């Protein structure tokens, strides 16, 4: 486990602060669209293997704080977006599909919602936590831009001037295994440190689209990232 290796190295070298980056997915699925934002002491109820491993890593990090006094801080972030993001992620994937004249591929109904936070706001949040956060505490890093995947697709189509083709540019495909309905987190602890979100959603989305329209050629081959369900080879089948 990579986290264990890093914790051991941090313990040996007496690091001043160990900031562990987790995810809002460890809280599990919001029961409805009216579910209150999750606060840091909410019980962890991960619903998929990725979230379960992130929760397990958190417990390991906390154990090093309690057992060895390692100065740890844990962050749980929502969806990050902005220039330079890998093309398999939602916004760059949709942008690159549209730029190539293809329909965006929406899992299920597309009504699943996520909060999005611009990468520059995320960077400032980490800087704030690194210098001001309390050792041993957990901090949510979330945006105020809750959007359904379908809404994001329609906004990208509009930004790219393709509104008259919207009906043909949205393709619904079978959903992913247990695709959580909603994640939403409370930022109060982070805001108490002096951080606040600065980038408006509309401006951040436009900046992101313009970057990918200009620089997506930097990725040598992104075709695999643009399919509806990227194939992951099984370790068992490879033996």
Give the location of each predicted region.
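Conserved active-site helix of classical SDR/Rossmann-fold NAD(P)-dependent CH-OH oxidoreductases
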Residues: 3-4, 55-62, 92-95, 123-124, ...
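Conserved active-site region of classical short-chain dehydrogenase/reductase
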Residues: 1-8, 88, 120-123, 127
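Conserved phosphate-binding and hydrolysis motifs of nucleotide-dependent enzymes
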Residues: 22, 50, 119
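Hydrophobic structural elements of the Rossmann-like NAD(P)H-binding subdomain
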Residues: 19-21, 75, 94
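Active-site loop/turn elements of alpha/beta-hydrolase fold enzymes
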Residues: 23, 77, 109
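C-terminal substrate-binding subdomain of Rossmann-fold SDR/epimerase-dehydratase oxidoreductases
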Residues: 92, 98-239
């Amino acid at each position: 486990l990579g986290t264990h290796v890093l914790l051991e190295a941090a313990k040996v070298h007496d690091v001043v602060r160990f900031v562990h980056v987790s995810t809002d997915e460890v809280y599990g699925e919001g029961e409805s669209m009216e579910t209150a934002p999750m606060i840091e002491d909410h019980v962890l109820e991960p619903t998929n293997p990725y979230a379960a491993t992130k929760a397990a890593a958190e417990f390991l990090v906390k154990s090093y704080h309690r057992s060895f006094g390692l100065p740890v801080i844990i962050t749980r972030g929502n969806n990050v977006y902005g220039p330079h993001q890998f093309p398999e992620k939602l916004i760059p994937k949709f942008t690159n599909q549209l730029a190539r004249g293809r329909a965006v591929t929406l899992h299920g109904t597309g009504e699943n919602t996520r909060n999005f936070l611009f990468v520059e706001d995320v960077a400032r949040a980490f800087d704030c936590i690194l210098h001001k956060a309390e050792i041993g505490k957990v901090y949510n890093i979330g945006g105020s831009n809750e959007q359904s995947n379908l809404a994001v697709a329609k906004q990208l189509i509009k930004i790219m001037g393709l509104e008259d083709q919207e009906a043909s540019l949205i393709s619904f495909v079978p959903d992913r295994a247990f695709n959580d309905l909603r994640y939403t987190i409370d930022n109060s602890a982070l805001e108490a440190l002096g951080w606040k979100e600065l980038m408006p959603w509309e401006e951040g989305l436009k900046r992101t689209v313009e970057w990918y329209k200009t620089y997506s050629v930097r990725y040598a081959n992104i075709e695999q990232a643009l399919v509806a369900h990227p194939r992951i080879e099984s370790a068992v089948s490879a033996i």
